[in-house]
Amino acid sequence: MNSFSYDRPPLQEPRPAEPGEWPEFEATLAVVNRDVTATLPGQDPLILMVAPSWQPLPPNGIDRGLVFVAMPDGRWQGNAVNADLEEGDPPEPDDAMTALSLVAGAAQDTIMELLWQAWPICLEHKVGMHLRPAGTTDDWHGGETDTSNPEVWWCRGSRDGTCHDVSLVGELG
């Protein structure tokens, strides 16, 4: 059967990740959820959802699924946080900073798209913040991954160019 066949077996439904199934992502989501709790009163913590891959598996392949950061009801927005195993990467990042960057970015996408609001907000300037490595406050950051500096929520500031690091991810409270 080819992947375009109408006889293709149905995909499994997305499901919440089992405890311990994705330990690095679970640990980093706990950090991000501290910011969710501190900045969105009444918002329950985000969860990890696992959806089956829609692509055919390679011979002897194991489908561990695609991992998304989701609202408590299971809805998510954005890309999966786990690696494409066909490229030979490990399922979870080897370092905590990369995992934190992936999970915090996915959490921001999910919250902003599903709650229709900027998140998180700089209390000084009343604008949405961006995720980036600490100490790169000069201006817009090209998005290069820099695992030597911790991830922070960064504010573009006002029109006078007063951009600044606001807080380490997980410490907005």
Locate each region found by the language model.
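Cys/His-clustered metal-coordination modules, chiefly Zn-binding fingers
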Residues: 87-173
